[in-house]
Amino acid sequence: KFPNAKLVVHPRGARHMAEPSKLIAGVTAVYGAEYVAKMYGEILPIPAERIIEAADETTISLNGRELLCIDTPGHARHHNCIIDQQTQGIFTGDMFGLSYRELDTDGRAFIFPTTTPTQFDPDEMRASIARLLSYQPSAMYLTHFGQITDLVKLSEDLLRHISALTQ
């Protein structure tokens, strides 16, 4: 379908992309076989020659745009965030929590940490949040869901939620 496409992935995840049996087993243990089949269908291995391991501070050029991959454990040990060097926007994956506009109240964005059952590490997550903020991002783009910009306030909310979950 995309014969020239490459997969950019954290080094800890690369082997699971080439041989996904442990990944499939882990996802199935958390969500169940029926859900995995419905949501993901058949999970196929990626040929090793199409995998790019993005170690911490790897820069990827995408059509002339420089993207900086940052190692950000906490949600999972194999997590990267991507900084668009042109805009200083950060694509956070699941690292900077989830935020749905439908849950906003009184003009404030709702944010809550994503805590995977198997790899959540609150101390690593706190350190990764601080690291992301040290880049002084213009915005963060959450996988779940969309753009957020009140980053100092939302990071305080996120850190408070992490503390509440781990007490």
Please tell me what each predicted stretch does.
Residues 12-16, 147:
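Short histidine/acidic/glycine/proline-rich micro-motifs that form metal-
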Residues 2, 21-24, 87, 105-107, ...:
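Short, glycine/charged-enriched secondary-structure capping and boundary segments
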Residues 15-71, 77-149:
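Metallo-beta-lactamase
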Residues 1-9:
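Active-site metal-binding motif and surrounding structural segment of the metallo-beta-lactamase
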Residues 25-29, 130-139, 147-167:
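Accessory terminal helices/loops
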Residues 8-10, 92-93:
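Generic beta-sheet signal
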